[in-house]
């Protein structure tokens, strides 16, 4: 049984790992481009490096999650993946512009195969580290780690590259990921009894079947992914809005406002969670709420009001993401929990990329129509979540506030 206060210390140790590896993950996207330009003079090669780091993670998410659900010694597996990711960044930092481009891209791709364990895979461990009654707050704080990394990671990479060297900047981020991986070894994850069974082809589809058949998981997964198609388009929309307001800084400033709002929303939700009995409903409500301030952006006469609208929308995405994480943990069975997390994260990334690409194709529609389309996408996603929640298991899957009683806090 967990001692009073022990869960708090375990959560703190987990958050140290999460911040280190996610700072590295977010910062690497900027550092890779800067490194490529410095060493080769080609921003295109930088884009190829970023793609090599990100795309394999989408493909590797199902097998990585399934393997994590089967492996017996979880600490070694998760620590090894994080260390390999960080080591890959360090190798790229030394080899870019000096070794053949194909070799450097292959190393980045190999590191990218580990990214599902930095995001959803790492989050899936919280259910084994934190007492059931504290998991709602724990997932909110984990959402904060994503927000902080998304804001601070690129800034840290830029600052390190400007003050030292682009290669050293990427190597430092890689070292942070390696340190995070080593700290995983201090987390009390017990070896699985009966673990180590060989991975079968049927195991790879276990989470996909759950996301299609289980009403709560189906609802929160596909609703959040559909909403992400809209928010994925926002970087393109913000560039067009900056031109509309004749304010160049608004291209990044509006996205920063949304990120800061999301951070604030996550902190408030961690302090006072709501809707914890049915997180899938919280996801749908927050999707709808996200679209309301975005729909008001066209009426904003100046960039200041648009900035406020984006910040308010961000305040809604913080609780949305925390409820999504809590819902995955609550409804995913033990045998497929990590795979549900990694596959869900992969779907969100895919939908976001699709939204960004579609916005780029449709940019001639103008910022007003595009931002209204993003707002409508959130409303449609909320409606989709409500429809997908219908099913024979929807009512029976509601669980008490304390969460599943069958899972011990220390795994």
Please describe what each predicted stretch is.
Residues 13, 17-29, 53-66, 81-82, ...:
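Substrate-agnostic recognition of the 12-TM MFS/MFS-like secondary transporter fold
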Residues 58-95:
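Conserved MFS/SLC helix-loop-helix module at the cytosolic interface between two early adjacent transmembrane helices
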Residues 1-12, 189-223, 401-411:
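Juxtamembrane intracellular "pre-TM" segments in multi-pass secondary transporters
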Residues 2-58, 209-258:
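Helix-loop boundary and gating motifs at the non-cytosolic
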Residues 128, 176-199, 387-398:
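Helix-loop junctions on the cytosolic side of multi-pass membrane transporters
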Residues 59, 63, 78, 84, ...:
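C-terminal transmembrane bundle of multi-pass solute transporters/carriers
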Residues 33-39, 152-173, 240-244, 353-374:
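Transmembrane alpha-helix termini and helix-breaking/packing motifs in multi-pass membrane transporters
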